[in-house]
Regions:
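Positively charged, low-complexity terminal tracts
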Residues: 1-66
Length: 66
């Protein structure tokens, strides 16, 4: 099941400014991510497991530039 994009509760970090942020919505075992500057644009959807693995990689520095 995918996130219902019409009724989704989109959230963004309180640390972000008004220009250029990602928004995240969760529904059950699904997580959706979109660009806040283009809310009607493409949306990436992940399982909760995939999203947790991505966040762990960010925290662990897996995606940092050398």
């Amino acid at each position: 099941m995918k996130v219902d994009l019409v009724t989704a509760n989109w959230r963004k970090s309180s640390h972000s400014s008004n220009n250029g942020c990602v928004e995240v919505a969760r529904s059950g075992d699904q997580v959706a991510v979109r660009d806040s500057k283009d809310p009607s644009g493409p949306v990436l959807q992940f399982t909760a497991h995939e999203w947790r693995a991505f966040l762990a990689g960010v925290r662990d520095g897996e995606f940092d530039s050398p």
